[in-house]
Amino acid sequence: MGATMTIPRMAFAIGILAALGLSQAASAQEATSWNLYDSYTTSYTINYTKNSSLDPSGAALYVMASVAGGTPVEYQLDTGSQGMVLPQYLLPDFQQSSDLQKIEYGSSGNYALGTWTTQTVTFTDSNDGNGNLATAEVEVFVAAEYYDSANPGGVSCASADSGCAHMIGIGFGRPDTGWGPDYLPSLNNNPLLHLTGMDEGTVRAGYVITADGIQAGLTSANAGTGFAYVQLQPTTGATAPNWQTTAGSVVVNGTSSSSPILVDTGLQYMWADLGSSIAGQSVPCASNASFNCAPDGTQVSVYFGGTEGVGYSFVVGGTDNPPATPEFARLAGGGVNTGINVLASFTYVFDAVGGFVGYLANDPQGSGITFSPYLSAIGDFDMPSSFATNLPVYIAGDSVFSTPDNATFASAFTGIGGLTLDGPGGIIFQANMTLPAGITVSAGSATFQATVAAPLAVDAGASVSNLGTIVGNVTNAGTFANDGTVDGNFANTGVLSGNGTITGDLTTGGGVSPGHSVGMTSVQGNVAFQPGSYYVAELGAGGTSDLVQSGGQVFVDNATLYVAPTAEWKPGFASYQIISAAGGVVGNFDVVAPSFGAIDAPYPFLDVDTTADSDGLQLDIVRSGIAFASVTETANQTAAATALDSAAVGLNAQLVVLNAADARWAFDQLPGYVNASVKGLLVEQSGLIRGALDGRLRAAQGGVAASAAPVVGYALDGGADNLAAAPATTDGLAVWTTGFGSWGEMAGDDNAAGISGSTGGFLIGADTALGDSWRVGLAGGYSYTNFNLIDRNASGDSENWHLGIYGGRTWSGLPAGDIALRTGLAYTWQNVEANRSVAFSGYADQLAASYNAGTLQAFGELGWRLDTAVAALEPFANLAYVHLDDGGYTEDGGLAALSAPSSSMDTGFSTLGLRVSRKATLAALDATLRGEIGWRYAFGDITPMATQTFVGSDAFTVAGVPIAQNAAVLQAGLDVKLGQATTLGVAYAGQFGDGVTQNGFNANLKIEF
């Protein structure tokens, strides 16, 4: 029995109904449903017998059933009791226990003595749509004796005419008074809840009672749409599953009382326990003078579920009453029993699994009927997966909603109880909610899309998304995304995000992170960052940033500001307003910016600074104390980085936004060390000219491993006929020509990338004898060199014009063999074109330099010829000096362009080696095999250098690829005399050492005419 409700509470309940939109209009029940039963498709139709009636004077419902395959008989259905009772005569061979049990009917006081036994119950006039009968394996009560008002001494149930009860109790929640001693009322002994498939879970245990029959097994078709549902509470302390009687209220002549409401098909009248509220207003009942009844004219209303949304009203003795009106209204104890007649106006659902009863008005607009679909919740509601409903919800008492994954409520919430959302999944509320007792999100997530009039608490680990308006104070210890309005104060120890508004004050001991990435949190009152709290200010695209906007003051007390750039942020020097406060900012943040100002940070060369003023707090991106050179790994990178740090203009804006790795890559491209490496390449390629001049001298001297190709001889008398082919060793004036070429690369080191190059060209010369032993000559020519920096976007070429003089002599007839001296001096004019590209994050440039260079070289060689029976040998020693001058350059291009003054390079080469040649016959042709092996040593300037400047920077020096200090020199050649006037010569020259490879090849065909 509940306490009598006061008028203010009833007024509140009426207001709740208005908020829910509950009315008697037929439109209120259209398309209202839930998907609780969508996964079930099977139900059993159980027909009533012809003796069934809902007439007030003799209402009762009967079905045909057999037990243990016996004769089917008629049983009365009773929602006011539990358990199936059959007389002993239906199981004549059944042996009763010596310890009889008792089952009593509380409304009438009738009872039976007998024994419980498990039997097969078959409803013989039933069908599941596939021809199957409704069958249950369940405990039934076999009555040996029956006691009622007509037989107070009891009768034996051994014969069919004994008058013993044939009853199937399908109710729940009746008190256990009169039962025992070993059995209590339980859902376990209800045959309608244990039909085939129900215990296995494939059929939803429950039933629908209509005026035409019973649907056993709940589906979306018979119970999913149009009903008002009231949640039941489990029976406390029960040893077997059961539900408590439905909560409700009754109003008599304007006086309301909350009370359990029992829909009892075993009773033809109504009773109500009103205590003293109608004292002096009761009269003897017309049909039974021993009962007290409400007198004619008494106004009675019965409501299910704690609201006035579902119920019926009648006037005792009235003429315009609904079909639900009972034969008479008895005034007695024990709550409210509607009797069977309520089923004349309502279809009734019992869900034994979920713990719900449902009501569907047969004529919602009929006289005295109040009906609008809704869900009245109280206690624990464990929703199935993907639960969804558009039923309005009334929270009749403190409730806990749980969902395994997600749930959606499309209609309004009201009620007097508190609502706890216990996850672990997420629940979406799409309509208004009015819950003065408050909402607690203890786990999982909740999304509010409309107006929520309730204080709200969010526990740690839970999350809330507010897309509407919350009218009430919020306490958040979890994650709260406010993209609507909180009309109240907000106390935060969790994390607050979103782009919403708080009309009151924001007090935070947790985190504030406006927006969803970059956004604004607006607070109309004051903002207080308490000790231990933090503000995550994100920087976004287009100069945007997070903003906390306050209509009052912002107080900061030992709080931390975390600065976090987003992926869309374009780094650079800029200012951002991160707090706007009408009353200014009091206090300072400890600033933490892990993305800035450290070598391993994404932006090592940038840092943050804050400035508070009367308008708020400004965040500035400034240059950090990390020098560019702090991230470099090579000398060239360091040189360029140091120079760029010295420049107040130029590339700084592009470089300060880089991380360490990108900066190193930039500093590897920016130094322009291709300009240094080209110098080394040109010095290396000068050896081609020395080699050609030295080779002509050796040929003229008949030296070892010299080419045997003829030259053009010229007689001094000047006659035209005096021009003729002559052997290479001719004493007269000789005109000669040779082609040369090479390709190779100089491998890079940790400081500079390697360079590859190729050269092709020719020389034309003339020489003559001078005195008895000397021969001198003059030569000139042209060559073309191209080069590429390996794995770098740098390349170029050089056009080269050559002029040289050479001379030598031999000392023959010495006891130890012939000695030969060979010397020369040459100069090369070079026109160099160098192109490079620079590309790193946020910057690209194409650069070109064009400049002149000149190479002066001198060489001398001594050779000692030794003839043996096998071959001719010549040990030799060669010394060369190379001086390179370039005229300086200024690159065309952008901010990465370099300028350099003229510079020079002086390099010496010494070579010790051995040449060998041998005559041979190849396929009957005369041939000469020749070869050379030696060791070359470089000294002086072997690492080319370039001193350059960027615009506005200090000068810096970078190193190119070094010339190999030690290298092996190899040559091999073959001359074949193909005929009297034809000679074919081929030769290979190579140089290997210290990462340097150079290969040369030439071929010549000489035909004498």
What does each model-found stretch correspond to?
Residues 6-14, 18, 367-384, 545, ...:
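Outer-membrane translocation/initiation segment of Type V secreted surface proteins
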Residues 22-28:
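Sec/Tat signal peptide C-region and signal peptidase I cleavage site
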Residues 28-376:
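Pepsin/retropepsin-fold aspartyl endopeptidases
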Residues 230-285, 523-524, 869-931:
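Aromatic-anchored, glycine/proline-accented short structural segments
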Residues 365-376, 387-479, 485-486, 490-491, ...:
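Extracellular repeat-rich scaffold modules on cell surfaces
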Residues 400-405, 481, 485-577, 583, ...:
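Extracellular beta-strand/loop-rich repeat segments of large surface/secreted proteins
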Residues 654-868, 985-1009:
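Outer membrane beta-barrel translocator domains of Type V secretion systems
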Residues 809, 813, 856, 876, ...:
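Outer membrane beta-barrel transmembrane domains
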